[in-house]
C-alpha cells in the first residue's frame, strides 16, 4: 500500500509506523540523488509558505529548513528566540491559530514537547519538531539516512552512543534503531541506565522501543565500558555534554560524570575497521570555540580529559577518515525536504 503522509505532523517519531519512517529515509535518499535537478527544474510546492519558530538557535536546522523550502518552491519565514511573544505575552494556542491561518506548515525548535503538541492541536497545519528536550526526530532521520547511504542495509548493524545517554539525541537514536532493526548500545553512567529504562518521562518511550525491537529486530543494551561496547560496532556516535540552554557552570559536573566516555581513537580501534563516527554537531573537539577554550583554560589542568579543549570527542577522531559528521549534517537538508514534501505535497 502506498505511503500517504499528507497532512501529518512530525511531532514525535513514535507516532509513525515502521514503514512510514523507512519511507521517509528512502525518500530523502532519492531526493539527494536528484538534488541538482530539483534546484533548477522543479518547484513542487510553489505557492505554499512555511514558518520556522525557534526558541533555540541552530545552524543546521535553520539552514536545512530554509534551503529545503526554497528548493521546493515555498516561501519561508524565520522567527527567532526574540521574534515573537510565543508563550510569553501570547498563549501558545493563540499563536498556533494565527500561524496556522497564514502558513501551510510550522517548524518548531524549542524546549517543551508539550509546545509541539499544542501547535499540532491548534494550528490546523502540519507541524515539524525541529528539536525539543524530549526528542529530535529530524536529526534521527538524517542519522539513519547517513548510515544507510554509507553502510547499506541497516538491519543487524550495530551503533554505539557514548556520553549523555539520557538526552534527546540519544533517545531519538534509540527510537530510530528500533524502527530500522539495528542493535544500539548506550554507553554512559550507570545511574543513567536506570533512568532511561524506568525514569519518569523515559519508561514509556523505552517500552515503546522494546515493542518495536520485537517487531523489527535489533536491540538496546547498556554499558559503562566504552571499549567493550565498541567491539564490532559499525557506527560510533556522541553528542555534547551540555545542551543548548543549560548553564555553563554545569560543565565541571558533566566532565566528572561523562569524561570517561569521551570518544577517542582507542574506542575507534576497538570497533570494526570501517567504523564511521557521527555527531549531530556542533562538536567540542578542539579549543577553537570560546566555550572549549574556556574549558581548557579553567579545567584542563584539573581534568586531563579536556586539557586540549576537546570534550565529547578528541580532535584525532574528528579529523580522521572515520568522521562522517559533515555528510550527516548535509543529510539534514535531504531528510527535512523529504518530511516537508511528504506531509505537504504527496
From Swiss-Prot:
The keyword Cytoplasm applies. PROSITE patterns: CARBAMOYLTRANSFERASE. It holds the Pfam family OTCace. It is an enzyme of class 2 (transferase). GO terms for cellular component: cytoplasm. It is found in: Cytoplasm. Carbamoyl phosphate binds at residues 58-61, 85, 109, 136-139, 280-281, 332. Pathway: Amino-acid degradation; L-arginine degradation via ADI pathway; carbamoyl phosphate from L-arginine: step 2/2. Transmembrane segments: none annotated. L-ornithine binds at residues 168, 239, 243-244. GO terms for biological process: arginine biosynthetic process via ornithine; arginine catabolic process to ornithine; citrulline biosynthetic process. GO terms for molecular function: amino acid binding; ornithine carbamoyltransferase activity. InterPro entries: Asp/Orn_carbamoyltranf_P-bd, Asp/Orn_carbamoylTrfase, Asp/Orn_carbamoylTrfase_sf, Asp_carbamoyltransf_Asp/Orn-bd, Orn/put_carbamltrans, OTCase_ArgI. Keywords: Arginine metabolism, Cytoplasm, Transferase. Its EC number is 2.1.3.3. It catalyses: carbamoyl phosphate + L-ornithine = L-citrulline + phosphate + H(+). Belongs to the aspartate/ornithine carbamoyltransferase superfamily. OTCase family. Reversibly catalyzes the transfer of the carbamoyl group from carbamoyl phosphate (CP) to the N(epsilon) atom of ornithine (ORN) to produce L-citrulline. This is Ornithine carbamoyltransferase, catabolic. It comes from Mycoplasma pneumoniae (strain ATCC 29342 / M129 / Subtype 1) (Mycoplasmoides pneumoniae).
